[in-house]
Amino acid sequence: MGPGLLCWELLYLLGAGPVEAGVTQSPTHLIKTRGQQVTLRCSPISGHSSVSWYQQAPGQGPQFIFEYANELRRSEGNFPNRFSGRQFHDYCSEMNVSALELGDSALYLCARSL
């Protein structure tokens, strides 16, 4: 069995339901293989128009990916174009990562603000 068959991508999401942070993320855990695509969802509690996405790799602090406000991308960090997203009229947001790489294994967080 070659080493490529044993290489799995593990993507974690924090928050299985509404909490004080004011967001619901889904799915909460996800296992994908290299080269696949993934869609992560974030639903903020109503009244919060801005959603930010972060990646936290093992042993590191969170890194800013991008922020959406009122359905428009307001700012973005230094991530490749494989990371894309959008925000809907109800302020829910999706982040897509295409062509997964080993370095994408991380905890992914979304945060809301007014």
Swiss-Prot record:
What start and end residues bound the annotated signal peptide?
A: 1-21
One Pfam match, given by its short name, reads V-set
User: Gene Ontology terms, cellular component aspect?
Assistant: plasma membrane; T cell receptor complex
Task: Please give the positions of the paired cysteines in each disulfide bond.
Answer: 42-110
Q: Which GO terms describe its biological process?
A: adaptive immune response; cell surface receptor signaling pathway
Where does the UniProt entry place glycosylation sites? 96
Q: Which PROSITE patterns match?
A: IG_LIKE (PS50835)
Record keyword 4Fe-4S present: no
Keywords in alphabetical order, please.
Adaptive immunity, Cell membrane, Disulfide bond, Glycoprotein, Immunity, Immunoglobulin domain, Membrane, Receptor, Signal, T cell receptor
Name of the protein this chain belongs to: Probable non-functional T cell receptor beta variable 5-3
Q: Which organism is it from?
A: Homo sapiens (Human)
Every copy of the Ig-like domain together lies at 22-114
Primary localization: membrane
User: Which lineage?
Assistant: Eukaryota, Metazoa, Chordata, Craniata, Vertebrata
Q: Which InterPro entries does this entry report, sorted A to Z?
A: Ig-like_dom, Ig-like_dom_sf, Ig-like_fold, Ig_V-set, TCR_beta_variable
Q: How does it assemble?
A: Alpha-beta TR is a heterodimer composed of an alpha and beta chain; disulfide-linked. The alpha-beta TR is associated with the transmembrane signaling CD3 coreceptor proteins to form the TR-CD3 (TcR or TCR). The assembly of alpha-beta TR heterodimers with CD3 occurs in the endoplasmic reticulum where a single alpha-beta TR heterodimer associates with one CD3D-CD3E heterodimer, one CD3G-CD3E heterodimer and one CD247 homodimer forming a stable octameric structure. CD3D-CD3E and CD3G-CD3E heterodimers preferentially associate with TR alpha and TR beta chains, respectively.
